[in-house]
């Protein structure tokens, strides 16, 4: 009797849900229809708005080209790509209107342009219109202590919506890695869209870190120690990677900055027919003016690091390896050594990280030998590189590494991380000759630094000559040719 009652209850529940299936399906269908109609109405409204503010020159309507770059005043390698891209486009298409969506609301457009000139020595020939976005906080990583990738990606859609509501372009370029804005501008804004990808939001390497339960800056120790949490995070990553691939595939053209990035984007976005490597522009000519002889104003050796103070740059590894070098090798080398960390601070989070690094150097007892140079001018940067013996880079799987190229062009002996762009594209043999060194661990960096410093001046000079000869492929001129070739599809 109890079994019959139980069977009847299960049957009743199933019948109840079955009775809801078709009404639910109809409701979902109606909602989808309303959503499509709503998006169509919004698109129609935006197109009318675009026509009402469009301008013409010599009787021809001007094309509006917009770059989505919320941190355009940050002063990093990604910003150099932005300004060089604008300079190249203005040369070839001077009649177009150029717009930059930025969240740098505390400065004026002219101050942003002046900063680009000071840091990168880049001056644009024609005006640029800046659209200032007030909701940039939606893409700050500090806002999402958990589910950071998802939070920032959803936040970028809202930030993109703010941008689209202020100015509707004809051509939209995501130059900072906010791929979730692409379908918004393509299907709602009616734009032709493209991407310049510095670093995939998620990569197969990140999946491997979680799968193997390895701790890292994007995989907290409490998760890596727990098999259940690791499994849950892996599922989250796989789902996110699937959606990331869908939004990325909306691009009409895709430019990537290295072989490493290309491999990951092809795996995730599956748009090989419109994807090309466009190496980022590195100001090699300016640095090539630095003499190669070892000019020494003070005795000893200077070790220089270039890179924004972000967690993935792993400046802590540089300080730890340098402390190890001083503690274990300095007596053998007999030199006065100094480490100078040069980089840009975008916000309070970056400033907090700098203070943490200062504390680390104090705890390791090397504070007298470590200096921090924040948001310095281009001339100051060039001066430090002219005095440096070693250029340091410690980011795991750096997408490319403009700082690495700049160090090589300036004549430092580069010591970079044995992964990503530096390993695959930059610190590679030139005509069979060594162009620099690679390392991974604290001990490996300390040993490599000691080895470089133990070389004779003539041996270091030969390595520096090899490095300089190998980097012509990363010049501004090469970037302009490749970038304009890719952009032609969107502008013709």
UniProtKB/Swiss-Prot annotation:
Keywords: Endoplasmic reticulum, Glycosyltransferase, Membrane, Transferase, Transmembrane, Transmembrane helix
Intramembrane stretch boundaries: 234-254, 400-420
Cytoplasmic topological domain residue ranges: 41-233, 255-399, 421-492
GO BP terms: dolichol-linked oligosaccharide biosynthetic process; protein N-linked glycosylation
Enzyme's top EC category: transferase
Cellular localization per UniProt: Endoplasmic reticulum membrane
Pathway the protein takes part in: Protein modification; protein glycosylation
Protein name: GDP-Man:Man(3)GlcNAc(2)-PP-Dol alpha-1,2-mannosyltransferase
Species this protein is from: Mus musculus (Mouse)
Organism lineage string: Eukaryota, Metazoa, Chordata, Craniata, Vertebrata
């Amino acid at each position: 009797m109890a079994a019959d009652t139980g069977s009847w209850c299960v049957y009743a529940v199933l019948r109840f849900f079955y009775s809801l299936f078709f009404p639910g399906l109809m409701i979902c269908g109606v909602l989808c229809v309303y959503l499509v109609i709503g998006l169509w109405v919004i698109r129609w409204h935006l197109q009318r708005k675009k026509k009402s503010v469009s301008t013409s020159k010599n009787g021809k309507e001007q094309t509006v080209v917009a770059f989505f770059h919320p941190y355009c005043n940050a002063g990093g390698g990604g910003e150099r790509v932005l300004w060089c891209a604008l300079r190249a486009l203005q040369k070839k298409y001077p009649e177009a209107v150029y717009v930059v969506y930025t969240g740098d609301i505390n400065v004026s457009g002219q101050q942003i342009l002046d900063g680009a000139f000071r840091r990168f020595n880049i001056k644009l020939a024609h005006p640029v219109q800046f659209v200032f976005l007030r909701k940039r906080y939606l893409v700050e990583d500090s806002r999402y202590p958990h589910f950071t990738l998802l939070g920032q990606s959803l936040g970028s859609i809202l930030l993109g919506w703010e941008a689209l509501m202020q100015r509707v372009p004809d051509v939209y370029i995501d130059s900072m890695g906010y791929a979730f804005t692409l379908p918004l501008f393509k299907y709602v804004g009616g734009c032709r869209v493209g991407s310049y990808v510095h670093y995939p939001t998620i990569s197969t390497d990140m999946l491997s870190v979680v799968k193997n339960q390895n701790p890292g800056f994007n995989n907290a120790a409490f998760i890596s120690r727990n098999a259940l949490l690791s499994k849950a995070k892996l599922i989250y990553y796989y789902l996110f990677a699937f959606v990331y691939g869908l939004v990325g595939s909306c691009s009409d053209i895709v430019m990537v900055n290295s072989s490493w990035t290309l491999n990951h984007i092809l795996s995730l976005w599956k748009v090989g027919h419109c994807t090309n490597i466009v190496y980022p522009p590195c100001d090699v000519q300016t640095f090539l003016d630095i003499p190669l002889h070892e000019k020494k104003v003070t005795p000893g050796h200077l070790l220089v690091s270039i890179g924004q103070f972000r967690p993935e740059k792993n400046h802590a590894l540089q300080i730890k390896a340098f402390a190890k070098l001083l503690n274990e090798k300095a007596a053998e080398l007999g030199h006065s050594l100094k480490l100078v960390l040069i980089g840009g601070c975008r916000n309070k989070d970056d400033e907090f990280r700098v203070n943490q690094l200062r504390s680390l150097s104090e705890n390791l007892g090397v504070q007298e030998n470590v200096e921090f140079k924040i948001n310095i001018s281009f001339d100051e940067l060039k001066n430090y590189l002219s005095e440096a013996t070693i250029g340091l880079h410690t980011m795991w799987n750096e997408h490319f590494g403009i700082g690495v190229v700049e160090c090589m062009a300036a004549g430092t002996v580069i010591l970079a991380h044995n992964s990503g762009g530096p390993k695959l594209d930059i610190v590679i043999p030139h005509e069979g000759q060594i162009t620099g060194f690679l390392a991974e661990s604290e001990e490996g960096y300390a040993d490599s630094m000691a080895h470089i410093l133990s070389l004779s001046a003539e041996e270091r000079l030969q390595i520096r000559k090899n490095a300089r000869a190998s980097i012509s492929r990363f010049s501004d001129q090469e970037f302009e040719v490749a970038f304009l070739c890719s952009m032609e599809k969107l502008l013709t």
